[in-house]
């Protein structure tokens, strides 16, 4: 009996060690002398405004967590919806496909969809629209049809958005539209034969030690693309750190070289006239990343 208890304790310790191995290292604040009082002020400032929600805050410096705080009802294991930050994960998958040679940024979007999914008559602009246009939110689709696409289980999301009128020539103007992200997710699936979620779990999440995740799918079984990914605070921090290191994790290249810089560089201006350069919204948009 004693041997069984000792074995169980050893297995429990081993399991705990394995879980902790996936965590980012925590800084010794006494050793580093880092003052975290300003981060406390951020928490207080944000939570004092009834219109804002802050569930958690994690600050990473030099690869170490120097501050983390969770509001009541949340903890380090809580999975939180990333909303539009999910778009950056779709972009990550596109980058992997481009790096593998399975996609090109200048590929025509309509080439990945069946005649049944496309309008009976293809406009010049729809035929012109590329993967890159979708990435930088310049598809020509002005109206976001998320509500319409998600209003019933029978809707074919791709067919619905592709039938939508385009208001400007693709690649010329910025218009934020979450259905661009869904089209990218669908294109990725057609080009690679696997869903964005399957690819990222295998090629990105596994090496980063991200083990808990929840995804939202269309009725067609395709990741929503523009929203609907749930991760823990630390998992999101790991992705940020991966991009800060040009896609390299513990000496291993995860993302194609240069992709991190490419997605984070301004690819299009929200206001080409530059009428309000101090507005963060008009600071430029990358490949599904704000710059």
Regions found by a protein language model. Give the residues of each.
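Bacterial Sec-dependent signal peptides at the C-terminal "C-region" and cleavage site
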Residues: 15-25
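Active-site helix/loop module of the DD-peptidase/beta-lactamase fold
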Residues: 100-139, 163, 192-227, 231
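Sec-dependent N-terminal signal peptides
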Residues: 4-13
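Active-site-proximal alpha-helical segments within enzyme catalytic domains
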Residues: 180-187, 227-248
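A small/polar active-site loop signature that marks catalytic segments
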Residues: 139-218
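Beta-lactamase-like hydrolase cores
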Residues: 28-59
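Active-site Gly/Thr loop motif
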Residues: 210-212, 261-291
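Active-site SXXK
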Residues: 63, 80-109, 134, 184-188, ...
């Amino acid at each position: 009996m004693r041997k069984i208890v000792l074995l169980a304790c050893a297995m429990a310790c081993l399991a705990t060690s394995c879980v902790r191995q996936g965590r980012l290292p925590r800084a010794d604040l006494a050793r580093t002398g880092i003052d975290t009082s300003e981060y406390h002020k951020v928490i207080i400032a944000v939570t004092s405004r009834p219109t804002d929600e802050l569930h958690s805050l994690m600050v990473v410096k030099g690869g170490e967590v120097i501050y983390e705080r969770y509001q009541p009802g949340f903890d380090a294991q809580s999975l939180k919806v990333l909303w539009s930050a999910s778009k950056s994960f779709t972009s990550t998958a596109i980058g992997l496909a481009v790096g593998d040679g399975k996609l090109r940024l200048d590929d025509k979007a309509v080439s990945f969809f069946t005649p049944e999914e496309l309008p009976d008559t293809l406009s010049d602009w729809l035929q012109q629209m590329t993967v890159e246009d979708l990435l930088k939110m310049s598809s020509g689709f002005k109206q976001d049809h998320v509500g319409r696409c998600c209003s019933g289980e029978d809707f074919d999301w791709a067919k619905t958005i592709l039938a939508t009128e385009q208001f400007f020539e693709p690649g010329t103007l910025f218009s934020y539209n979450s259905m661009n992200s869904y089209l990218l997710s669908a294109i990725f699936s057609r080009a690679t034969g696997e869903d964005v979620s399957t690819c990222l779990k295998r090629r990105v999440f596994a090496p980063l030690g991200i083990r808990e995740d929840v995804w939202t799918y269309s009725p067609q079984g395709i990741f929503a693309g523009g929203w609907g990914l749930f991760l823990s605070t630390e998992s999101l921090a790991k992705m940020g750190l991966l991009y800060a290191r040009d896609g390299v994790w513990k000496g291993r290249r995860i993302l194609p070289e240069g992709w991190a810089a490419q997605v984070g560089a301004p690819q299009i201006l929200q206001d080409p006239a530059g009428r309000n350069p101090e507005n963060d919204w008009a600071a430029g948009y990358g490949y599904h990343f704000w710059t």
